[in-house]
């Protein structure tokens, strides 16, 4: 009887975690625009990705962070939805979020990126996809 009760409690707890998105899924972060960590991750992902694109001459930069979701794994996955645009900074320069501003005539694109941050603090861009302008 005790083991049946424990099993029911365990299964109920798993069901609650799955239903609320706590168990392995992404959770949306409220007040993401007030958190400078998310903006820094967005700039890291955008500048890293744009520097690796063949034929590009300028970095892309973040115009706006639209949405942030996190997933706890062996570290944290940050799924960021962004508005990005080509910046005034050439790829031959060093990217700086304060000086690499969007070009006045640049088209803004909506992009989704996933940045993985390990438990040791190392970051990498897992994916970066944009809708057509």
UniProtKB/Swiss-Prot annotation:
Q: Reply yes or no: does the keyword Signal apply.
A: yes
Q: CDD domains under this entry?
A: CY
Q: Which Cys-Cys disulfides exist here?
A: 89-100, 111-130
Q: Which interval of the chain is the signal sequence?
A: 1-19
Which InterPro entries is this protein grouped with?
Cystatin_dom, Cystatin_sf, Prot_inh_cystat_CS
Q: Where is this site: Reactive site?
A: 24
A GO cellular component annotation here is:
extracellular space
Q: Where in the cell is it found?
A: Secreted
GO molecular function list:
cysteine-type endopeptidase inhibitor activity
Q: Which keywords does this Swiss-Prot/TrEMBL entry list? A: Disulfide bond, Protease inhibitor, Secreted, Signal, Thiol protease inhibitor
Does the keyword section mention Signal?
yes
Query: Assembly state and interactors?
Result: Monomer. Can form homodimers in vitro, but probably not in vivo. Homodimers are predicted to be inactive; dimerization disrupts the interaction with target proteases.
What name is this protein filed under? Salivary cystatin-L
Q: Which lineage do the record's taxonomy fields give for this organism?
A: Eukaryota, Metazoa, Ecdysozoa, Arthropoda, Chelicerata
């Amino acid at each position: 009887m005790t083991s049946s009760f424990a099993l029911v409690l365990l299964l109920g707890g798993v069901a609650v975690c799955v239903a609320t998105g706590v168990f392995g899924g992404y959770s949306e972060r409220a007040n993401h625009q007030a958190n400078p960590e998310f903006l820094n991750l967005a700039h890291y992902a955008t500048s890293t990705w744009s520097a690796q694109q063949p034929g590009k001459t300028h970095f892309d930069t973040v115009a706006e962070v639209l949405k942030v979701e996190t997933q706890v794994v062996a570290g944290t996955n940050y799924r960021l939805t962004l508005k990005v645009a080509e910046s005034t900074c050439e790829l031959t320069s060093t990217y700086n979020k304060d000086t690499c501003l969007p070009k006045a005539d640049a088209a803004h694109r909506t992009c989704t990126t996933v940045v993985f941050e390990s438990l040791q603090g190392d970051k990498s861009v897992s994916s970066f996809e944009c809708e057509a302008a």
